[in-house]
Amino acid sequence: AERDPDKLVDIIAALEPTLGGVNLEDIKAPECFTIERRLRERMKIPVFHDDQHGTAIISAAAVINGLELVGKQIGAIKLAVSGAGAAAIACLDLLVALGVKRENIFVCDSRGVIHDRREDRLDESKKRYQQKTPARTLADVMVNADVVLGCSAAGAITQDMVKVMAPRPIILALANPEPEIRPELAKAVRPDCIIATGRSDYPNQVNNV
């Protein structure tokens, strides 16, 4: 497997005459953003990163339908996010385009909330979602959240976090193979929640295309 982004771009671009489109898979952030952008600039065929855009499309559909079921408007929701990799950022970009207000989005990576006083170096994709907020943890930002999007790791969302969400919360726990919180645990403390995971053995599977 090629690990040099420049070489990977050259290899894929050289295949253009024999392809109708390119589907990128399993390329980590932030390299995936650069590779996709450069390929789109060089190639005249569609370039699609499934881990980003496939997940974003299906997740956005889940949010739209979930909000309709619980009677909430997309422009009024508070969104908490666990994870800030390629899939999470693509989901957020699409949700913003669909009407979620950027000031109502609170993103957590492995170091906590992406806030305006962070001293570590953030890549451009994360900087778009920096917030001026005293919140520092996922538990903090999940208070009164209408939707939580999990694109992180098993167990990242606890029952205590779910308890303090807004009425009729929507939980997208998309980590695979083990979700951020299992549906039975979420339902035990919030029977009013709608929860989707990336697994086919639970109801409401939300996965990439």
What do the PLM-derived regions correspond to, one by one?
Residues 35-42, 135, 142-144, 152-171:
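Rossmann-fold NAD(P) dinucleotide-binding segment
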Residues 1, 26-29, 50-53, 110-112, ...:
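Short, ordered loop/turn segments at secondary-structure junctions
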